[in-house]
């Protein structure tokens, strides 16, 4: 069996309320555990609409059929009215996920992190993580041991800002395999587990059409020579394309692919991991900068 980390990002109020229960049902049916990363503060995702002036973002929204994919309640959230508090309004759903799956922090305010984390000082970065962490821990009633920043908006500043929270791992960038980010003076930071595989919205309309996506993704997994990690979104695979995701899980099992929480990808001895950095870069199918893995050693 080929082991693949399954990361589930939950960005919005509707994704939490409607998408997560459907995903829990599907994962339970297939006997799969995953890592859920929750946004718990205000849902201001509609404020991304200003990015439509950027051709690359506009093309992404058009080719992914964003209005039918996400729904207007998501696309307009937090624009003409204050965004609803995601965690406070969906505590039972988040607790249900925590009963059977690994649960980590995605963001306090997903929109603000994507829009401003690149210029925030380190103190503000740490404050945003702390706000989300305290809220998520209050909801699930236990310490949160992992996190994954919104939109992979991370660099070495973010790595350093998160060091005080004692996470087991972070999943803040795109890359090929888990690594130890270097903080300077020979000191290593918290393990990073990069996402290695394309997401639905990155691939559909560019590399493949909707009908061919499952086959495309499974072929990517088979070719992945690193430590494969796949990200889905509660707003996509948990709502509009839940049936297609169900088919993907069936096909994966038939091809001896086993999805698992990200923590199960870590070695017993972290000294085996390569060292590296999280640097800014770009990725086909995604607008704007994101964190990319830059390996400095190959590891054992």
From Swiss-Prot:
EC number assigned by the record: 3.5.1.n3
Top-level taxonomic group: Bacteria
Enzyme class: hydrolase
Pathway, per record: Glycolipid biosynthesis; 4-amino-4-deoxy-alpha-L-arabinose undecaprenyl phosphate biosynthesis; 4-amino-4-deoxy-alpha-L-arabinose undecaprenyl phosphate from UDP-4-deoxy-4-formamido-beta-L-arabinose and undecaprenyl phosphate: step 2/2; Bacterial outer membrane biogenesis; lipopolysaccharide biosynthesis
Cystine crosslinks: none
Keyword set, alphabetical order: Antibiotic resistance, Hydrolase, Lipid A biosynthesis, Lipid biosynthesis, Lipid metabolism, Lipopolysaccharide biosynthesis
UniProt-recorded Gene Ontology molecular function terms: hydrolase activity, acting on carbon-nitrogen (but not peptide) bonds, in linear amides
GO terms classed as biological process: 4-amino-4-deoxy-alpha-L-arabinopyranosyl undecaprenyl phosphate biosynthetic process; lipid A biosynthetic process; lipopolysaccharide biosynthetic process; response to antibiotic
Gene3D superfamilies according to UniProt: Glycoside hydrolase/deacetylase
GO cellular component labels: membrane
Pfam family, one: Polysacc_deac_1
Entry's family note: Belongs to the polysaccharide deacetylase family. ArnD deformylase subfamily.
Classification via HAMAP family: ArnD
Function: Catalyzes the deformylation of 4-deoxy-4-formamido-L-arabinose-phosphoundecaprenol to 4-amino-4-deoxy-L-arabinose-phosphoundecaprenol. The modified arabinose is attached to lipid A and is required for resistance to polymyxin and cationic antimicrobial peptides.
Name of the protein described by the UniProt record: Probable 4-deoxy-4-formamido-L-arabinose-phosphoundecaprenol deformylase ArnD
Species name: Klebsiella pneumoniae subsp. pneumoniae (strain ATCC 700721 / MGH 78578)
